[in-house]
């Protein structure tokens, strides 16, 4: 069960204000995430990432392919959990861009070479796979599963196809990234099925 946490962490609450635009909310949430991570020692960060792992592994039963991600900057790492998935026989795949203008694909290989955006990805010789479960990095998420990403649209394009294939989409982040307010949505947004943090796993109900 998720322990409720303030939208931007206990140390840096947002003041009362008019609802922010999506871009302003993105900047505020990203700044808050960076500020939160700066308060953590390496040991504290590692403990929180280990605390996240069982909430993710609880979703692995019957999953043949897990779509993971390489954490960038202040993103929380799912790697302790994906290593457990590999240990029990699941394939762990990572996003790979061959053309920045097209949706990325998941390749069943370790992310060992830099992609076009500086994010490590598998070599293109590895096979393309279809994940059953996708772990999705984010800047923020609300109670409807609306995800706030970096604003480039890469995950939006990829998630649309993955959702149609029946993949389960789970956002992954620090507890303070779960916002109490509603994130402004766009027609192309693909809602997440849940959100996992060190505090727990929340599965979103569809109305």
What would you call each of these model-derived segments?
Residues 2-129:
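N-terminal active-site beta-alpha-beta segment that forms phosphate/nucleotide-binding
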Residues 72-74, 139-143:
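Short glycine-rich anion-binding loops that position phosphate/pyrophosphate groups of nucleotides
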Residues 101, 134-138, 151:
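A short beta-strand-loop-alpha-helix capping motif that often carries His-Thr
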Residues 2-25, 31-38, 125, 129-134, ...:
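Surface-exposed, charge/polar-rich loops and edge strands
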Residues 83, 150-156:
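Charged helix-capping and loop-helix junction motifs
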């Amino acid at each position: 069960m998720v322990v409720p946490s303030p939208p931007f962490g206990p140390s840096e609450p947002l003041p009362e204000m008019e609802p922010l635009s999506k871009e302003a909310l993105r900047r505020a949430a990203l700044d808050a995430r960076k500020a939160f991570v700066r308060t953590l020692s390496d040991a504290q960060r590692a403990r929180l990432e280990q605390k996240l792992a069982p909430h993710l592994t609880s979703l692995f039963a019957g999953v043949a392919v897990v779509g993971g991600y390489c954490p960038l900057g202040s993103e929380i790492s799912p790697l302790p959990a994906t290593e457990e998935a590999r240990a029990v026989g699941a394939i762990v795949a990572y996003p790979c861009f061959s053309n920045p203008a097209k949706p990325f694909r998941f390749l069943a290989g370790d992310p060992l070479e830099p992609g076009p955006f500086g994010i490590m990805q598998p070599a293109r010789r590895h096979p393309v796979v279809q994940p059953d479960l996708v772990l999705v990095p984010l800047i923020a998420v609300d109670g409807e599963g609306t995800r706030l990403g970096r604003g480039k649209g890469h995950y939006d394009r990829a998630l649309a196809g993955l959702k149609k294939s029946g993949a389960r989409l789970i956002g992954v982040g620090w507890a303070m990234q779960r916002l109490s307010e509603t994130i402004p949505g766009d027609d192309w947004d693909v809602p997440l099925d849940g959100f996992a943090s060190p505090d727990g796993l929340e599965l979103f109900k569809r109305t």
